[in-house]
Amino acid sequence: MDQAKGYEHVRYTAPDPRDEGLGSINQRFSHDSSTNVNTYVRPPDYGVSTPARPVLNYSIQTGEEFAFEFMRDRVIMKPQFIPNVYGEHSGMPVSVNLSALGMVHPMSESGPNATVLNIEEKRQSFEHERKPPSRIEDKTYHELVQSAPVISSKNDTGQRRHSLVSSRASDSSLNRAKFLCSFGGKVIPRPRDQKLRYVGGETRIIRISKTISFQELMHKMKEIFPEARTIKYQLPGEDLDALVSVSSDEDLQNMMEECIVFGNGGSEKPRMFLFSSSDIEEAQFVMEHAEGDSEVQYVVAVNGMDLSSRRSSLGLSPPGNNLDELLHGNFDRKIDRAATEPAVASLTPLAGNESLPASQTSQPVTGFSTGNEPFSQPYLGQQLQFPGLGNHQIYTSGHMASIGYIDEKRSAPLHVQPQPHYIPYSVNPETPLESLVPHYPQKPEQGFLREEQIFHVQDPETSSKEAKMRRDDSFQKVNDHPISTVESNLSAKEPKMRRESSTPRVNEYPVSSMPSDLIVPDDLPKEEAPIVTQTSSSTPDPSSSTLSEKSLRKSEDHVENNLSAKEPKMRKEHSTTRVNEYSVSSVSSDSMVPDQALKEEAPISMKISNSTPDPKSLVYPEKSLRTSQEKTGAFDTTNEGMKKNQDNQFCLLGGFSVSGHGTSNNSSSNVSNFDQPVTQQRVFHSERTVRDPTETNRLSKSDDSLASQFVMAQTTSDAFLPISESSETSHEANMESQNVHPTAPVIPAPDSIWTAEGSMSQSEKKNVETNTPEHVSQTETSAKAVPQGHNEKGDIVVDINDRFPREFLADILKTKESLNFPGLGPLHADGAGVSLNIQNNDPKTWSYFRNLAQDEFERKDLSLMDQDHPGFPTSMTNTNGVPIDYSYPPLQSEKVASSQIHPQIHFDGNIKPDVSTITIPDLNTVDTQEDYSQSQIKGAESTDATLNAGVPLIDFMAADSGMRSLQVIKNDDLEELKELGSGTFGTVYHGKWRGTDVAIKRIKRSCFIGRSSEQERLTSEFWHEAEILSKLHHPNVMAFYGVVKDGPGGTLATVTEYMVNGSLRHVLLSNRHLDRRKRLIIAMDAAFGMEYLHSKSIVHFDLKCDNLLVNLKDPARPICKVGDFGLSKIKRNTLVTGGVRGTLPWMAPELLSGSSSKVSEKVDVFSFGIVLWEILTGEEPYANMHYGAIIGGIVNNTLRPTVPNYCDPEWRMLMEQCWAPDPFVRPAFPEIARRLRTMSSSAVHTKPHAVNHQIHK
């Protein structure tokens, strides 16, 4: 002890190399009071030489002596180099980062040495790590041995530093393992190569003890990711499909052992993934449906968009496949949350993160959910306080309301404020957030309201004068009919609904629209705009009853949420809504209804006020609809949560979508004051059919009705029309919705609504802007519906979805939408374009399309399925549960309801189709094909009767009186000679039938696979079309002989005319010596055949040389016949052999643009122009071009086949006119046939010269 007190100064002349870096007791301890740092300053060297003596090591704190060898073994040998804290530039090691070892020196916590600690790492370290007994036993020694001296290297300047080390340093580093920890993302396939990738979320490097237990690990993981439910890890070099789950201590031990092996090999670290319960379910769904929506999911995940899938009664469903919407940021996480937060917490401007502590920034709160939030918790009511607007009470009568997350930048604390009758909440920036949100152990289905729930807002204090215009606009006065106001009170006296009945009735009373009193102040911050519903008001001041620029939009979109009923009880069996003894009106304001999907038992309450303003005082701004188009694109949510067989939705009310269950979600959750870019409107059309009142009780599957996307023109005719029952087929380019609605009163006259079948005058077209309508002019002609199948010019109007698979059109439309061709445009006179908001875009460059469509269709070269594909439930059921066939265009008559509604929309994923209703008075439709119509009517009526009787469908179809003209051929009468080819549609054989050469097409059973109702419907379609084909007789149309129904295994087959030389494509490739005259004859025959088909109202849609059959037996007169034009209902399910790539070059721009689902027969004329080029050159168009380039070039009219120099001027002119971008310019087939006949006649008198060239493949 004396030596320790004397501090002898001894110089070591020959220190042991092993001892370098350790030092001895011969160092002076001093305390630097100025810096509060414990330093160890070595005394100067006096050059004293002494004999070798043992090294004595003492503890500075206790003075106890201990063995040097023991200390050497316990101290880490590799110090870290850090800058000299005193500024001296010595290269010696001076300090060890204790925080990296999980330890802190007790004497240096507050000094500069504390800067070595990684504060962030310290904060994120695990505080509950298990302490083994050995570590506790070593505690005394750990306190004793806190430091060791350091000896400099040979180049040491003499300054030496004491290093703070721990006796447990080496043990701590060896007992911990580093992992990459990822959470919050998704494992989904990359669209380009379908390889699994983890995208989105966060990734951190964590360090855990190798001896940690599984329970402790889970606890620590939940500190990082509170929603963690499953832990999986990925070994280096393994793919994401080889993740290993950790669910027990044994699994954890195996993981640690694997990590030790890979950790010693290099810097590559094993990766750990934390998954929540929803992540697992979502990943499984994405994998099952990766083909249809992987790109959208990938883009969402990569960009961190908050677009979580939601549950429906049929399973998880992606909220939307409109990639363009995503790319335009409509579903950006922060923006999306803003749609739900303002109603709850975002009421005052807040700077930075001052609104809430960090611990509260992701606290779930009750609010209006767009369906994208991951949690839902119940509340019954809340009162919102808006600056300058007073209180607005929001009631939710029911079980659950969705909950969104508050963003730290847009939030305010909330507190409870008692109110009578309900459990209200008041937004108050002085109360903590937790007091508002009740916590429940079980969360409901994500993003949806529970049953028996409604939203409404009351504005008791706002006066009607606040509804004055805030902006300068020109106005037009409306008619003098009385207009009543809706008291925006969705509360119901009897909010409960029973599943047994939901029977809304609508009759007797007129409907009108008027403004609301609530106007959001202009000075209210855009992101703080409250989400409220329309408010009640007394009789407005006639001088102040004006509609704001943005108000008409909301009344269009949200009247469905503003109706209240005296008897709101609903039954599931009957789905009509009762609106008796009241006048219903639409309220317009700058407030909005929460976009919630009211589920099956949501009451449709209709509480109507009796105040009636002076109608002459109501003025509508011209630009109100323009604002509607500009603003409603901000948050276009989708509600896939509707359950099967639900029908609580109204039809358009004066151009407004009135929905009992809130499924009309065309931007209905938009925050009106958000300045968001205009979302590309979805392609959405209407086919309106007056229905018999007895048929309005049909149930439906509803997911995403966009009925209110229809724009109502300002009317100058009567505002009140008789109320009638109707049905509407809703068409949408990329989201399915099929919803049969009950009837509702209609405000506008027939000339005030643009119908999909209606036609517009030229003056109307001029008044409709191609991008976003500035205003909607009053209509000048009555917009009566065009007869089904024809427009006013006599052209054939058909549905493209009737002939093309849904995925095929989905891919095309997806590409098209990415090209920024928004929704709908005005209807052309020939029905070629039906649109409300089509944008006139400048042609894009080649590089744009190339980048856009890169790998877009790489894996699409296969048969694709249509919306009516078996297994995809499109048929509905009536009240008796009998499947109803909705395969053909509706047939209308005044007193006979159609039992068929045509599927008009492109379906995607598992979303069910939506058939909505609308009342269109004076709707006259004339069927275009008598035989076709009769067969449909008979088939539909007798189908139901047969199903009820339990008779097999095929037997019934064959025996149907309307199909007696169809020949049923016995399979035993056929003799198969040779297989000609096979594809997804089936196999074609050359055979004999009663001594005649025939082509036998055996249809694969897969074309009819699915549920029994789907098989029945598809089989019904097959028989109907076969019966139509059997009635076609023309020398240039392939003859249809009959149908075989008793083929091998019960398969169906068709027997048609056999053409010796096969397809024209085969002939052009093999026979290079067709002279000009023969080519003209072949083209002329094809034109004759198409003229005949069009005269029978049949559009081919797939006209190309592969589908033109030729017979060259007579060298003087070749024969060409049009084939493969029938059985579209079956054929479209397979899209013939060759898939997508074999169809694109012949498709007209209107088919690819997606601006309309209604096209004319001129699409065949476009295809015929490409056929003329094929006949001329013998080559395939665009053989080496990418799919996306073909689509972009055709749509933008920058791509057509190159016409060779040897082409005759007449041929060239005819070709170019046929493939003209404007359908009006294209000639009809009678004109084409006449010109080809003239050219052929002139060719007889001239020597063939030009076309005898050598054709190159």
From Swiss-Prot:
Keywords: ATP-binding, Auxin signaling pathway, Cytoplasm, Kinase, Nucleotide-binding, Phosphoprotein, Serine/threonine-protein kinase, Transferase. RAF-like protein kinase acting, together with RAF20, as a central mediator of a fast response pathway to auxin involving proteins phosphorylation, and leading to rapid cellular responses including membrane depolarization and cytoplasmic streaming. Required for general growth and developmental process. Activated by auxin via rapid phosphorylation downstream of ABP1 and TMK1 signaling. Residues 769-782 have a biased composition (Polar residues). Its EC number is 2.7.11.1. GO terms for cellular component: cytoplasm. It is found in: Cytoplasm. ATP binds at L980, G981, S982, G983, T984, F985, G986, T987, V988, K1001. The gene is RAF24. Pfam families: PB1, PK_Tyr_Ser-Thr. Belongs to the protein kinase superfamily. Ser/Thr protein kinase family. Residues 191-277 form the PB1 domain. InterPro entries: Kinase-like_dom_sf, PB1_dom, Prot_kinase_dom, Protein_kinase_ATP_BS, Ser-Thr/Tyr_kinase_cat_dom, Ser/Thr_kinase_AS, Ser_Thr_protein_kinase. Disruption phenotype: Plants lacking RAF-like kinases exhibit growth and developmental phenotypes such as defects in plant height, rosette area, root growth and germination. Reduced root sensitivity to auxin-mediated growth inhibition and slightly delayed gravitropic response in response to auxin associated with a drastic reduction of auxin-triggered hyperphosphorylated proteins, but no obvious defect in auxin-induced genes transcription. Insensitivity to the promoting effect of auxin on cytoplasmic streaming in root epidermal cells. PROSITE patterns: PROTEIN_KINASE_ATP, PROTEIN_KINASE_DOM, PROTEIN_KINASE_ST. This is RAF-like serine/threonine-protein kinase 24. Hyperphosphorylated in response to auxin in an ABP1- and TMK1-dependent manner. The keyword Cytoplasm applies.
